[in-house]
């Protein structure tokens, strides 16, 4: 038995890890087009004489994970099986990083409430002032008669009005997807469950309460996966220990998780990793029960790469999934008191005026992981603005750093000269699920079933969720499905 996995990011690595454990007699070849594994999980340590540790740890992509939900359980299951619990950095639910979050609109910081008292105070802020009336009116708004997909922006405006959508939801979409909420698919976004609640109950405010009481938030597949994960003693134990944890990071950076998976895979005799070796051919084998990848026959192929790459290999229906690019600028100050406020960071909605450098958000990294005992932030710029007008992309890292420092001055009044900076353009890093994404995905899967005998399985951020947790969860589910298929055919 043999399986090929195309793509060495977190989704491909997770799939390989679970497959190798579930089917130890199966040969697994993992193909990665680049020189390293891990995809967008990129932690770098840069030498710095002014840091007590001699280096500064920067994250060039995502940096934290959450323990909550089914995806959170999948994160914890992988961590427990890798045995890297001691490398975690837990962030308490009571910490400033968990409680204090901000939206910058129109020219000031608006604190997002984390308590009832905070909610009372927050309604006087310009970004959140429309919320109370919108929440009161929401149950009385007409629901959508059909179940067709629509944009996140369209859905939210129907249910909560223009101001809440433009000032609050736009900020969230910028932070999660670096995208335009007017283009993003409601059904395929992380808010898709709200559309299901509207369809069943007619509104969100009361419907959400009823759905929570009836435990209807999770799909049957999610409930089954949750039960399977909690049946693992170490996973359940780790989950219980995370009750007061809002999120967690890794002491040596988020790349700890992908490096740990790679180390485990290298120890497994049934796994071979092929770096700098992309899938150049993907065709049905002459026996029609196998698939050829680069001339090698496999019983199944897990495609954990972009739909664009898949479309270049086989004559399948096109997903037409665009992407967002983000300039990530890391900034370190040896002074630990540079930040004027404490918290996780701030997000900027697209309707905020005077945002010429298209800043999406600023993360206060030193609140979460600060071995350097200084002040550390990450400024993220671009997203849909870069997609719509590529001339807005800074032509070099120096320009990006200058833009980021201007944004820090404008939003947080930070004028201090940084000790160390690092700028990285992450091109095409976040897939943008357009309206109709799920229908397109179903069409692609049907084509694979008909023309490739169902021998190709899709996983990763291009198909079923862009977060690390989504990728790990879907990698786990893909491995379980493959194990079931191969066991039933043997």
Curated annotation (Swiss-Prot):
Catalyzed reactions per annotation: protoporphyrinogen IX + 3 O2 = protoporphyrin IX + 3 H2O2
Cellular compartments annotated: Mitochondrion
EC category name: oxidoreductase
GO terms of molecular function: oxygen-dependent protoporphyrinogen oxidase activity
Principal location class: mitochondrion
Pathway: Porphyrin-containing compound metabolism; protoporphyrin-IX biosynthesis; protoporphyrin-IX from protoporphyrinogen-IX: step 1/1
The record's free-text note on cofactor binding: Binds 1 FAD per subunit.
GO biological process, one term: protoporphyrinogen IX biosynthetic process
Residues at which FAD binds: 7-12, 32-33, 40, 61-64, 466-468
SUPFAM superfamilies: FAD-linked reductases, C-terminal domain, FAD/NAD(P)-binding domain
Keywords assigned by UniProt, alphabetized: FAD, Flavoprotein, Heme biosynthesis, Mitochondrion, Oxidoreductase, Porphyrin biosynthesis
Record-linked Pfam families: Amino_oxidase
UniProt-recorded name of the protein: Protoporphyrinogen oxidase
High-level lineage: Eukaryota, Fungi, Dikarya, Ascomycota, Taphrinomycotina
Gene name per UniProt: hem14
């Amino acid at each position: 038995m043999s399986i090929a996995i195309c793509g060495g990011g977190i989704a491909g690595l997770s799939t390989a890890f679970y497959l190798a454990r579930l089917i130890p007699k199966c040969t697994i070849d993992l193909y990665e087009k680049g020189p390293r594994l891990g995809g967008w999980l990129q932690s770098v340590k840069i030498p710095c004489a002014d840091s007590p540790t001699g280096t500064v740890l920067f994250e060039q992509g995502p940096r934290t994970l959450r323990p909550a939900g089914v995806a959170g359980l999948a994160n914890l299951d992988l961590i427990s099986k890798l045995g890297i619990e001691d490398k975690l950095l837990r962030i308490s639910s009571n910490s400033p990083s968990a409680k204090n979050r901000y939206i910058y609109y129109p020219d000031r910081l608006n604190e997002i409430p984390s308590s009832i008292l905070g909610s009372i105070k927050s309604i006087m802020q310009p970004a959140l002032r429309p919320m109370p009336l919108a929440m009161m009116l929401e149950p009385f708004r007409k629901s959508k008669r059909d179940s067709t997909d629509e944009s996140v922006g369209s859905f939210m405006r129907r249910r909560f009005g223009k101001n809440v959508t433009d000032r609050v939801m736009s900020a969230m979409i910028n932070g999660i997807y670096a995208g335009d909420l007017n283009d993003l698919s409601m059904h395929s976004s992380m808010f898709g469950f709200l559309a299901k609640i509207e369809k069943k109950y007619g509104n969100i405010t009361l419907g959400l309460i009823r759905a929570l009481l009836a435990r209807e938030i999770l799909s049957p597949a999610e409930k089954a996966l949750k039960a399977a994960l909690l049946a693992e003693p170490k996973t359940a134990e780790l989950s219980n220990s995370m009750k007061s944890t809002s999120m967690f990071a890794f002491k040596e950076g988020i790349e700890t998780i992908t490096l740990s998976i790679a180390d485990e895979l290298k120890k497994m005799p049934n796994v071979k990793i092929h770096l700098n070796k992309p899938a150049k051919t993907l065709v049905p084998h002459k026996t029609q029960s196998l698939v050829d990848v680069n001339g090698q026959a496999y019983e199944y192929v897990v495609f954990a790469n972009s739909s664009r790459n898949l479309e270049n290999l086989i004559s399948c229906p096109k997903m037409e999934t665009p992407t967002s690019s983000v300039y990530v600028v890391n900034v370190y100050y040896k002074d630990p008191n540079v930040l004027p406020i404490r918290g996780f960071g701030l997000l900027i909605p697209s309707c905020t005026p005077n945002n010429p450098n298209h800043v999406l958000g600023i993360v206060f990294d030193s609140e979460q992981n600060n071995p350097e005992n200084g002040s550390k932030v990450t400024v993220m710029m671009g997203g849909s603005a870069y997609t719509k007008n590529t001339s807005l992309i800074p032509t070099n890292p120096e320009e990006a750093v200058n833009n980021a420092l201007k944004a820090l001055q404008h939003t947080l009044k930070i004028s201090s000269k940084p000790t160390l900076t690092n700028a990285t353009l992450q091109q095409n890093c976040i897939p943008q699920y357009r309206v109709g994404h799920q229908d397109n995905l179903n069409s692609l899967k049907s084509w694979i079933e008909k023309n490739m005998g169902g021998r190709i399985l899709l996983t990763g951020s291009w198909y079923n969720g862009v977060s690390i947790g989504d990728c790990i969860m879907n990698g786990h589910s893909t491995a379980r499905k493959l194990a079931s298929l191969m066991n039933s055919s043997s």
